[in-house]
Amino acid sequence: YLCPCCYSWVQFACLPLHEVQVLVRISPPMEEVVIVGGARTPFCEWQGGKRGDGQAGGLLKDYSALKLGEIAIKGALEKTNTSPDDVDHVVMGYALQTCDQAIFGARHAGLGAGIPQEVPMLTLSRICGSGVQSIVTGAQMIMLGEAETVISGGMENMSQAPHILRGMRDTYKLGRPPKEGTVLEKGMEDYLFTNLLDGMCGSFMAQTSDEICKRKGVTRQETDEFAALSHSRTANSIDNNIWEQEIVKVGDIGHKDEDHVVRDSTSESLGELRTAFGPESLVTAGNASGVVDGAAAVVIKSASRAKADGDEPLARIVSWGIVGLEPAIMAYGPVPSSRKALDKAGLTIDDIDRWEINEAFAGQAVACVKDLGLDISKVNVNGGAVGIGHPLAATGTRLVLTLAHELKRSNGRYGVATACIGGGQGIAMVIEAI
């Protein structure tokens, strides 16, 4: 069993009672896991949307998710002075698999970044929590002694989400394209749009935010005030280069090109926008997270490996919590997952200096902040997904990386990064600045 005091694996065998003897073998304590550093690409408005200034989006539309992941991995290696030869495993989240080579996922991203072909690589999906899950999975590998250095991250290109035709297998042979003029008879499906609907509960993701807001008494005014604050904080972070140290360029596209934020947002202007699901809805284009393209990656190591390498880690991973909940209120996932992570860490809300809560929707974030009893001055202090956007699998890694840098910047100790997850889940991670 796992000793709750020292996290050592204890194996024992009890002999017959007449033999007064107990055999015990204690394995070495599990390694602590540290976040050495990382990098992310700019998060840029998708091709189908409009930037905050009203211009058409799509700065990253021609970079597949795998290419963005490759760039983020390269950036993480460079920013941490980590040799590709020292990497034991690559774990990358990829939720909305949109490119023609998507099935190869982390493998192509890692090989493209120069990781040796002998290194195993894993692609995973916990949808919006994938970027945190990849860090959890990497940490578990290290704690079990299967690796010492892991690249964890997430990658997404929403611009490349295809329109698809289902039910064509009985008409066209493998590898043969449909003839022009015949394909529309079956009906074309928007792959991005259909994946915003959870068929298990019959709700769009935005409707789960409306549902939890209804249950928790969140108002439209509170929602738009939070959204305006997110836009303002995001603009401040871009203008004052707060995120510059974590961003790696994609070609000539850098941290100043993060373009979803609407700089002149006020609660009054946001309050004039039409809601998505009728008069009872709170969700609008101005208080929901942006659809953007981007990727992020971090280098995590065992504490002993980091010490031997002469690293100066940003933080150590303290605990994590992953939960399931009613699909119709998936947006509430940060609350039970954060409580679980804090309980495992032996910490309370008062111990946490900074929170990074994914703003899938402003109303959902307000509900979580209120229910956890958080001080808004400690939450998403540099902006969040309403302002910067939410590239699904990449978001969680950005939350953790941004949190680690912010704890250093603010001289804080403990922080929590958390996200809701489509389908009815939540994930949270507690880290401690070093």
Regions found by a protein language model. Name each.
Residues L59-V150, G154-K173, I247-E258, A328-I329, ...:
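Conserved beta-ketoacyl condensing-enzyme motif
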Residues D210, E246, I253, V318-G387:
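Active-site pocket-lining segment
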Residues P28-A95, C99-A109, A113, T208-R220, ...:
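Conserved active-site "lid/cap" helical segment
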Residues L124-E156, I164, C213-I242, A297-S304, ...:
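Active-site-proximal alpha-helical scaffold in enzymes
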Residues Y63, Y94-V150, E185-M188, M200-F204, ...:
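Conserved catalytic cysteine-centered active-site region
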Residues T149-E211:
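Flexible glycine-/small-residue-enriched beta->alpha junction loops
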Residues A39-P42, W46-K50, G54-I71, K79, ...:
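N-terminal extracellular/periplasmic Venus flytrap/periplasmic-binding protein-like
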